[in-house]
Amino acid sequence: MDNKEPSLENKTVESIPAVTIRFAGDSGDGMQLVGTRFTDTSALFGNDLATLPSFPAEIRAPQGTIAGVSSFQVQIADFDILTPGDNPDVLVAMNPAALKAHLDDLAPNGMLILNEDAFEEKNIQKAGYKTDPRTSGELDAYRVFQVPMEKLTKEALEDTEITGRAVLRSKNMIALGLISWVFNRPLEDTENWINDKFKKLPEVADANIKALKVGYNFGITVEAFHHTYVVDKAKLPEGEYTNINGNIGLSWGLIAGARQAGLELFYASYPITPASDILLSLIHI
């Protein structure tokens, strides 16, 4: 499979004002990373946006169970928005548990992208389904796209230094590459980020970039995807903008409040997701 980034030629592109996308999977599937990367790429493109990450309440919930599902929702728009959206227009479900946990929120006729390799009988039962939801009729109200993410990942990495179970750690890049194609997001920014993050592990960087491009190319080569979408740049006042989440906003508020009050800031916390960002922000002061 050609790993070069394809052009936008010969595609039917539909312009839409906004879209809400939710990525969902096991807490180890890298959905927060995928959502954050898509968000950052959209911000650099010029969209306005808002995000809503969601983490399992349980510590070390069993893999493949609803209790262990992690999700990341983002709304991008060509106008000023204030919320991460309500019902997602697109749901990426990495396993049956993610589908079970989030399907009811998906908008009617919404796009549903499934990691079909995860829909084994044991995983279907573990998620609480009595029958395979893909054949029971309960997905008939949606546009379903089944993607063999694990198979594609193994094929993409077969000539790399990554082996064994570590190979499937890159399957989230398949999802990110595909969504990047569907919404005409460039890959260059994510490639640069991957190279910087794994500059001491070039073999890992290479593997993730390969998977990213394979996911992107999958959208082109599979006939099921008839066209793509584009959300144009938002018309916002000129100035400098930055992406922050609630934790970083809270950190900045604590710093500003302490300085205005002339007090020394003290913060006590346990370093666990999703509160770790507060500690990471405050250690720099």
Q: What is each residue range found by the language model?
A:
Residues 209-210, 256-273, 279:
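Carboxylate/His-rich catalytic cores and anion/metal-binding grooves
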